[in-house]
Amino acid sequence: MRSHYCGDINRSHLGQEVTLVGWVNRSRDLGGVVFLDLRDREGLVQVVYDPDLKDVFDVASSLRGEFCVQVTGLVRARPDSQINSQMKTGEIEVLGKGLTIINASAPLPLSMDNHQNNSEEQRLKYRYLDLRRPEMAERLIFRAKVTSAVRRFLDSNGFLDIETPILTKATPEGARDYLVPSRTYKGQFFALPQSPQLFKQLLMMSGFDRYYQIVKCFRDEDLRADRQPEFTQIDIETSFMTSEEVMVKTEEMMRGLFLELLNVDLGEFPRMTYNEAMRRFGSDKPDLRNPLELVDVADLLKEVEFAVFNGPANDEEGRVAALRIPNGATLSRKQIDDYTKFVGIYGAKGLAWMKINDLAAGMEGIQSPVLKFLTESIVNDIISRTGAQTGDIILFGADKANVVAEAMGALRLKAGEDFELLEGQWRPLWVIDFPMFEKINGGFHAVHHPFTAPRGVTAAELEANPANRVSDAYDMVLNGCELGGGSVRIHNAEMQSAVFRILGIEEEEAKEKFGFLLEALRYGTPPHAGLAFGLDRIIMLMTGATSIRDVMAFPKTTTAACPLTNAPGFANPAQLTELGIKVVEKVKVADGE
C-alpha cells in the first residue's frame, strides 16, 4: 500500500512518484490550494493538492484530522521561502496526484494538537489516539531501539535469552503478589513473578552460565511516578563471575547504549560505598549533578545548651548534619518556613538555620535563631567545615540518623533545583557495600533480597553479628535514579539457611516456601551473580519523559486500573464457582453500631 514512510522522504527522492499512507495531522485550504500534513510513525510530510485535478481536490478538501488516507504524488523541492527547518521533511513536499480515504474519523474525544489539555484519564482511555502523537511514537520507537541494542550486546557476549515461568509461587520480595487461582487445585494460587530471581538462579545451577531476559514483572504496590503494577526488567545472571566482573560487563553495556542512541559518552562510572553515599548525600542513589553535600557537625555540638542539637549529637543513633546553600542568605523567612514544612514530610521536627551575611564581621555578620546557644568558636568551626562564604545559608537537621538522612537528602535535591545548581546532564555511579540487613520494628529485613550473599564471612560469623555485615551487592545509579541493582548470590545451603533464620523465617516455613531452592543448593551449585535493570526507567531517563507511563504503550493509572479496557473487572459467577471462589461483600457499619 505504500512505497515509503512519510518521515523518510527527502531530497534524494526528488522527481520520484511515491505512495504514502497515514493520518491527516492537519489540513488547510490556502488560496484554493489544499495543504495536508500527512503523518505516520516516522514523521510528517506536506502534501499539496491543486484544483487542476478536480475530483482529487474535492476529496482533499473534505478531509479532517485523523482521517486514514493513501496518497500518491510526485516529490518536489519546496520554494526557498517555504522551507521548514523544524521538520525532518521540511525541504520537500509531495504534489498530490491521487487520494484514497481508507477510513474516516469521527470527531475526536481528545485534543491532538494541545495534549496538555487532555487529562491523564483521557490519554489512557483513548491510548490508541494518544500514541499517534509524534512525541509518543518517538518514545516507543526509541524503546524498541534500546531493547534491540541490549539484545545485540548480550547475544554477542555469550548470554542466552531463556524464558522463565509467569505462573509461579509467592516469594517474599518486599511487595504484595498478584495471585492467580488454580482451577485444578481449588483453594490454591499461583503468583505472578515480582522478578525471575529464583528461576534465574536455578538456571545457573543447571549450567547455563550466562542468562538474560527482557521480562515482565508484577508487583501489587502503591504507585508513584516511576512505578507500575506490571513493568519490564532487563534481567541478567552469570556463573563464575565476580561482582567486579558483572559491574564491568553491565557498565560496558550501558555506556554502549548511551553512545549508540544518544551520542553520549558516560565515561567510567565512579564507585561509592553505601555509607559514604548516605553520609554525603542522605541517599543510596545520589544525584551527583547536584554539588550540595551534607556535613556532619554533631561532634561540635555535644556540649551546647540546646536540646535540639545536643540530644542527637550525644545519641549513638542520632545525627546532626549541616547543608550549605551558596547564595542562600537571600531566602526569606517564608521560604525557610516552606523548607521546614518540606522536611516535616520526611519526619523531621524542625529546621535550624544560619545566614552568613558578612563573614568578615564575625558574629555580627551571622544571623540565626540558634546563635545564642553557640560560641564564636563553634560557629567558626561550622563555617570552616561547611566551606560557607558571605551570602550563604547553612541549614541543620538534627534527629535520628535515618530521619536526618531522608529529610536532609530530600532537601538537598529540592534546594539544588530551586537554586539551579545542577551541573552536567549525566552523572552515573555504582553504589556498593550495602548493609546485609536493616532493623525494622525490632526484626531484621534484607536490604536487597534474602538470596544476596554477604561479603567475606562464614554462615556462623554472619549469624553472630548480622547487624554489621556488608552484602556483596551493587546498584547502578544515574542522576539520582536507580537504573538497576544486583548482587552475588548465596550458593550454599548452610549460608542460605542462616540468612532465613536471621530474617525470622523458621525452618518449616523455609522448607515450604524455598524447599526446592535449598534442595538445589546441595548439588554442586556454582558461584553466581547478576543484576536487573528497570527498562521503563532507563527509557524514561534517556527520552526525558517525566513518568514511565509515557514510555509504555498501555500503562495503568496510579490506582492500577486500565481506563482503556476497564480492567480490572468483575468475574463471571460461573467462573468463580468453578474456581471455588466466593466474593465477600464489604459490610458498611453505620456510625454508633
Curated annotation (Swiss-Prot):
GO cellular component, one term: cytoplasm
UniProt subcellular location: Cytoplasm
Gene3D superfamilies associated with the record: Bira Bifunctional Protein, Domain 2, GAD-like domain, Nucleic acid-binding proteins
EC number: 6.1.1.12
Keyword Protein biosynthesis on entry: yes
Residue positions binding L-aspartate: E173, R219, H448, R489
Record region (Aspartate): 197-200
GO MF annotation terms: aspartate-tRNA ligase activity; ATP binding; nucleic acid binding
Any one Pfam family match given in the protein's UniProt record, by short name: tRNA_anti-codon
One GO biological process term: aspartyl-tRNA aminoacylation
Binding-site residues, ATP: R219, D220, E221, Q228, E482, G534, L535, D536, R537
Keyword terms of this UniProt record: Aminoacyl-tRNA synthetase, ATP-binding, Cytoplasm, Ligase, Nucleotide-binding, Protein biosynthesis
Main location: cytoplasm
Superkingdom of the source species: Bacteria
Oligomeric form and interacting partners: Homodimer.
Function, as annotated: Catalyzes the attachment of L-aspartate to tRNA(Asp) in a two-step reaction: L-aspartate is first activated by ATP to form Asp-AMP and then transferred to the acceptor end of tRNA(Asp).
Family: Belongs to the class-II aminoacyl-tRNA synthetase family. Type 1 subfamily.
Protein's UniProt name: Aspartate--tRNA ligase
